Structures are given as C-alpha cells and as structure tokens.
Amino acid sequence: MKLLSAVVLLALANPSDGRADAAWATATVARLNALLEAPNSERAGAAERLVSEHLAVDEFAEVTFGDYLEKSLDAYRGLLSSPRFTHLVDHYRSRLARAYQHRLSADLAVQLASPDWRGLRLDSLEVNGQRGRAQLRALFATRSLGVEADLIFADGTWKIAELKIDGRPVSSHYRRRYQSLIDREHSPPVLEAQLAEREFVVLEDFAATWDGSQPMEWGPWKKKDRQKPVLYRVEGRPRRYMAARDSSHSVIVGKFVHWNPRQYPIMTWCWRAAALPLGGNEFLDDANDSAAGLYVIFSKNWLGVPKQLKYVWSTTLPEGTVGRRDKLFRPWFFVVESGAANLGKWTFEVVDLEKHHREKLGGRPAKRTIGLGLLTDANSTRSYAEAYYADLRVWTRQAFDGGRVVNHCGGLPVSNGVYSGENSP
C-alpha cells in the first residue's frame, strides 16, 4: 500500500458555504497537485497543515484502533469510578489522536517527495447531506491506483473520515503496523512512542492529574494503605514531579503500565532525595527504609507472587550493593544512589532491566510488564524521608548501545524557583 499516507492529500479545502461540488473538488485537487512541485521544506509544512485542518483525526483514530484504549486501561476499571475511568480513557484518546496526526503528517511529507508520484485525478463526487464520497485516481509514472475518500461535514468544514486505496482501508494498514502492540494491550504511551518513531517511551512525566496535585494513574498498591494519609502529590512548574514525604506510614503507590521489556530494556529516571531516613539499611527489618525506591513489576510466578526488582537511594548501603532481606518473597534491591553526597540534587539513573532480571529473577522477562511502584518511607527507623521522582522512561538497547540515552533531568526545579542545570529533555 505505497500510497497509504499520501492519500491524505485528498483533504478537501473548506468551501465558505459548506457545499462540496465537483468544481470545488477539482480546484482542490489541482491545488494539491501543484504542491508536488513545491520545495521539500514547504511540503513538510503543508503536510502538517493538511492533516491538521482536513482530516477527521478522532474518527480516523477510532476506526484504526477501535477499543484498544479501553482494553489497555482495563486494570483501572475496578479501581476508579465510572466517570474517572471515562476521563482517563478520554485523556489518552486525545493524546493518541495527536500522536496519530503527527504520524500521518510525517508519512505524507515523505510521500510528497516521491519522484514516482505524478498527481491525482478526480473521477466523481457524491454528497448526501453531511456525508460525501470522492472517487479519484492516484497517478504514478507507470500505473495508477483507485482512491476513495469518505467525507464528513462537521464544525463548518469537510473532513476525511476514511480512505481506501484499491478498496483497502488506510486505517487497516496502520492497525496492522501496530497490531502486536494492540493485541498485547501495551499501554498508550508505548503506542504514542511508536507512532512518533522514538527510541524511548515516556512511562510517566506526572503531567496528568485529577485536581492539579493527585496523579491520575497512581494509587496505594495495597488495600490496607488506601485509608492512610496521602503521602504523594504532584508538584512543580513547568516540569512536574512526584513529591513523597513520610515519617510513619510506608505507603507504596503503584501504576499499571504495560510495555515489552525485551524491546525497551533500559530504564532511566530522575529523582532527588531531600531527607534520608536515619540509619536506613535495606537488609534490616528494623531499619528497612529508603529515601527513594522504584519498583518494576515484570510479571507473576505460578503462585501469583510478583516478579519484581527494586532500585533504591539508600542511607547507609554503598552504591552498587545488590541484595534482599532474608524473608519469603522479598524483592531484590539494587542501590543506585547512596548517602548524602547528592542530597538535594536531581540525579539521572540508568539501569538495564533485562540484565538485572536475568541475574536475579532468571531468564528473560515476560513480554508484558505489570506496572511500577514508588516508595519513600521512614517508619522502621522512626525518622523522616523526603524525595521527588520525575520523568520515567524506557529505551531500546540500540539507543543505549549507540550512546543516544541522554540525561533528561534538565529544567526540574530544585527549590525556591531554582532549576537544575543538566541537559534539557
């Protein structure tokens, strides 16, 4: 389906009176054909405008992805009220539509530069109220293809709701392109990253909240903790982060997020410890507190016990320490920051999830993770801990091996309007 994106050129201009007729459509096709002669720099901008202004992106995305969002977010259905679950789905629906729009624009810009494409010819146009259908031929140097555009008139403009090339829907092509991800119900940020053709997935940037401070997808992981005080809240402008403060409660907050850790095995994040629990030592029951802790829950074993790893900022254990408490089902932990040397500073962390899974949990990780957890606690030491978490990402191994995994902690506020000076994202 070589023309899969170029057919967005069928986007029809907006007649001032809302009518669609053959003369207007012919003029539009002529204008779009003229665009093929424009410089490449102009084509890219024109592709973005055409898709933005003339494609019914919401309808196109719904036809392409169906109920993918509802299925990928289904774990929240029993945890959120019906209005909140609907709001969560709508939040990601809007993000997915924007990502899809950018993908179509980028593909169209490439097709506009194809030397083999000669133009479009309008064969017929039928209009019935708020719906219409255009039949065209896409002309190439040695062949032509039939193109059918379903049109919808909404908000005072005609837009394309679906396209077919020689009878094959363009939406079906894109669905097939991402079929594996859709079938495995990986989380929306993964699909957004693949639509953007990025080498990393932003698992969490804490930009989405219910009320400005309560993170949209995070909540107490254990039922017994749901009645405890809220220890975590989103803060910061313009870049946001999760603030955690604890003295006696020790609440893990979790988020369901599903990605393939074989495809994206490198995890990076930013965190800052402001107060270390006194004498914290992750090996000891009576001192098992960490200023900051990040859990990665890969899967469950045959007993239903989570297969997970924990990365910590320890008060006393040296960086590089790996271990776990001598109790049943306790997770392996990795000390990636230690002590007060970097206290008050945003630090950038990089870990190889696949390597650590193989070393401590055995074999390769499952192809779909369960989620993430955060824990700042000081209950065992009866002291106080405070930390901040930001910008959790996973990367391809190719990006890591190629040196393209970069520090993305720049611009995070330290305190009183002072910002970190690391590289911007």
Give each language-model segment a name:
Residues F256-M267, A340-L343, P365:
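Extracellular/lumenal carbohydrate-interaction signature centered on repeated Trp-anchored short motifs
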Residues F206, L372, A390-V394:
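Extracellular beta-strand elements of beta-rich domains used
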Residues D289-L294, F329-G339, L343-Y384:
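Extracellular beta-strand ligand-recognition surfaces/modules
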Residues A193-K223, G403-E422:
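Extracellular carbohydrate-recognition regions
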